[in-house]
Amino acid sequence: MTWGFVTCGPNEALVVSGCCYMKPLLVPGGRAFVWPVGQQVQRISLNTMTLQVESPCVYTSQGVPISVTGIAQVKVQGQNEDMLLTACEQFLGKSEAEINHIALVTLEGHQRAIMGSMTVEEIYKDRKKFSKQVFEVASSDLANMGITVVSYTIKDLRDEEGYLRSLGMARTAEVKRDARIGEAEARAEAHIKEAIAEEQRMAARFLNDTDIAKAQRDFELKKAAYDVEVQTKKAEAEMAYELQAAKTKQRIKEEQMQVKVIERTQEIAVQEQEIMRRERELEATIRRPAEAEKFRMEKLAEANKQRVVMEAEAEAESIRIRGEAEAFAIAAKAKAEAEQMAMKAEAYREYREAAMVEMLLDTLPKVAAEVAAPLSQAKKITMVSSGTGDIGAAKLTGEVLSIVNKVPELVKNITGVDIARSVHAG
């Protein structure tokens, strides 16, 4: 019996069971203390096991028998305590060969099942898919035993009927066909490329010739442009010389004109000085006395204007005062006449027709005087008579009296007052 401190390498695990533990103590790649009484220690391998999974003559989904050899790497999982405990329950006390056999049988069963669900072409062309399906299905099943599938791959694929060989021959024929087609296409492409190269060579040659011709043309054009520029420069130089000569002549003429202008300016200055002298002389002899006389006359006119204004203002004031006096007199007279008229109106209301008769009698002499007034202005009167009635002054007097006698009737027609009746009644 082993007791005390017990150790193990990283490729195995210690399983301590007995007293003091409700479940076994699992120590992967470490050490543990084991009591001599009531406890025991066991070991389980954690080595990776390589399995060669043979599946001979398995019928695929198409009914074609093929044989597959797969290589799987499996081991007891020591990092997961639950899986390690499961592995201890399943394999503790068993040898690696026994564990290998259990895992191999399980993998072979899953491999055969996957082969039966796929076609030969699928397994042959997509080995990765086949390996993945076997790996996934077997991993979940072996995990329940505490074993992990590290890897799985197909080592060999074969058949006894020559099916795979036929597929290979067909593929070989396709490859040969594709090779011949590729060779023909390559030759055609080579011919095409040769033609393109020749075309490019000719195009390059033509382009080169064109460039040479263009360069020659550019040279000729530039040479002609240079010749034109040289001729232009020569012409410009000649024109510049002529222009400079013309400018020189023009400048000489301008200077001559400037001299004439200066001389004329001096003459004008002399004339202006003479004019100023004469103006000063004129101002001393005529203008100043005239201005003095003008000032005197302006002052006299201003005095007369002031006098006239004052006289006009005095006259206006006199007229205003006289007008006010006359207005007062007229107002007083009008007031007296109004009072007299009021008294007459009162008398007229009292005496009525007698007052009217009295007023008319007072007016009749004035009417007779106005009737005879034109006669008083006559310087000479010539009387013509037919011989009947009055003649001479008597005739004229009778005419006047006849007019006067018509006045009472006229008054009666106008006012309705009978003067003759009123006088007799009075």
Curated annotation (Swiss-Prot):
The keyword Membrane applies. One of its GO terms (molecular function) is protease binding. InterPro entries: Band_7, Band_7/SPFH_dom_sf, Flotillin_C, Flotillin_fam. It is found in: Cell membrane; Membrane, Caveola. Its main location: membrane. GO terms for biological process: positive regulation of cell junction assembly; positive regulation of cell-cell adhesion mediated by cadherin; positive regulation of endocytosis; protein localization to plasma membrane; regulation of receptor internalization. Keywords: Cell membrane, Developmental protein, Membrane. One of its GO terms (cellular component) is flotillin complex. Pfam families: Band_7 (PF01145), Flot (PF15975). Expressed in brain and ventral nerve cord from stage 12-16 of embryogenesis. SMART domains: PHB. It is a peripheral membrane protein. May act as a scaffolding protein within caveolar membranes, functionally participating in formation of caveolae or caveolae-like vesicles. PANTHER family: FLOTILLIN-1-RELATED, FLOTILLIN-RELATED. Heterooligomeric complex of flotillins 1 and 2 and caveolins 1 and 2. Belongs to the band 7/mec-2 family. Flotillin subfamily. This is Flotillin-1. The gene is Flo1.
